[in-house]
């Protein structure tokens, strides 16, 4: 079993993994999110012994489709292709939820890509059945979870 460790990082540390996994190696300027640099934002990186292999950002944002009180948006969840299906994504999400609980955040929500839908449903996220296309990226579902 590969050793993976998780830690809070600054948003710039996630740009390379976001670019590679989520944006087809796009320029980093296309890999930044509104709220990345807010003091309330939380960024988590997953590392093997030498490099970042995954990550996620938690950004204080009102829910876009359903009224959720005291919520954060889960953004930029990614794991390098060669490390997928090894439980790393689940570890990242579990750690993200713990970070939210420590801050007494009640709900997490996200715009989930179709190919990631089963992953989130296994982690007890609720599919609102609201679907929409994000230009240049594809069809997404609005998911949420009370934590």
Listing of model-derived features with the role each one plays in the protein:
Residues 93, 100-113:
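Conserved GNAT acetyl-CoA-binding A-motif
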Residues 45, 51-62, 73-78:
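Conserved beta-strand in the GNAT
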